């Protein structure tokens, strides 16, 4: 999961 305010990336990981 990703912290609030962050989006999941298709290849995996999060973008904040």
UniProtKB/Swiss-Prot annotation:
| Modification comment | C-terminal amidation is necessary for channel blocking activity.
Tell me where it resides.
Answer: Secreted
Q: Where are the disulfide bridges?
A: 2-14, 6-16
Give the sites modified to Cysteine amide.
16
GO cellular component terms, semicolon-separated: extracellular region
Q: In which tissues is it expressed?
A: Expressed by the venom gland.
Which GO terms fall under molecular function for this chain's record? calcium channel regulator activity; toxin activity
Highest taxon, organism lineage: Eukaryota
Per UniProt, which keywords does this protein have?
A: Amidation, Calcium channel impairing toxin, Disulfide bond, Ion channel impairing toxin, Neurotoxin, Secreted, Toxin, Voltage-gated calcium channel impairing toxin
Q: Write out the function statement from the record.
A: Weakly inhibits human L-type voltage-gated calcium channel Cav1 (CACNA1S, CACNA1C, CACNA1D, CACNA1F) (IC(50)=4.6 uM). In vivo, it induces reversible paralysis in blowfly L.cuprina.
The miscellaneous comment for this protein is: Negative results: does not inhibit human L-type voltage-gated calcium channel Cav2 (CACNA1A, CACNA1B, CACNA1E).
Family designation: Belongs to the poneritoxin-Ae1 family.
The name this protein carries in UniProt is U1-poneritoxin-Ae1a
Supply the source organism for this entry.
Answer: Anochetus emarginatus
